[in-house]
Regions:
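Active-site-proximal alpha-helix that buttresses catalytic centers in soluble enzyme cores
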Residues: 1-85, 119-137, 158
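Compositionally biased amphipathic helical and low-complexity segments enriched in hydrophobic
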Residues: 65, 74, 95, 149-151
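Residue-level marker of intrinsically disordered, low-complexity segments enriched
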Residues: 67-68, 141-143, 153-154
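Active-site-adjacent alpha-helix immediately C-terminal to a catalytic or transition-state-stabilizing loop
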Residues: 88-146
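Short, solvent-exposed aromatic-acidic interface loops
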Residues: 146-158
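Glycogenin-like
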Residues: 160-162
Length: 162
């Protein structure tokens, strides 16, 4: 079984492609709450995605493992980030994990929601910053997802983006 934690980036700076101070604090706080140790980290090309991963891992008190920038996490694929394209991208990330491995991927809304729909056929409510889905692929290839939601007081909203 492989596991991929796919999250939306934290709160961004309204004037640049980086996290705001609130976003850095949020990513670190969410990272502190994890009990997982990651074998691989994937981020979209956006600076705010890489920063989210860095602050998340800082909160989790983990070193940056093997990592990659994945354009598909920003919707840059042949399908333009369609549900099917995002689902295929998630499967490809799962394939890059070691057997029984755990990965962390940082993407954007609505792309995480599209991936969930492409994998399950079930729509989900829009994600707030640092929320996401936990994707489990069993040895027989069966995929299950679980929503990762934060308490309302933990999130400072910014506008939806890709």
């Amino acid at each position: 079984m492989e596991v991929l934690e796919l999250r939306r980036h934290a709160t961004r700076d309204p004037h640049a492609d980086r996290l705001s101070p609130d976003g850095r604090a949020l990513a670190e706080r969410v990272g502190r709450s994890t009990t997982r140790t990651y074998d691989r980290v994937f981020v979209s090309p956006a600076e705010r995605a890489a920063e989210t991963a860095a602050w998340f891992l800082r909160g989790a008190m983990q070193q940056l493992p093997d990592h990659a920038i994945v354009p598909g996490l920003a919707g840059h694929d042949a399908t333009g980030g369609s549900p099917e394209g995002m689902a295929d991208g998630v499967r490809a990330l799962l394939d890059q994990l070691p057997e029984r491995g755990i990965g962390l991927a940082i993407s954007h809304t609505p792309l995480v929601e599209r991936a969930a729909f492409g994998l399950t056929g079930v729509e989900m409510e829009p994600l707030r910053e640092c929320e996401g889905i936990l994707i489990r692929r069993d040895d027989d290839g069966t995929i299950a997802i679980e929503e990762l939601r934060l308490a309302s007081e933990d999130v400072v909203e910014d506008p939806p983006d890709q």
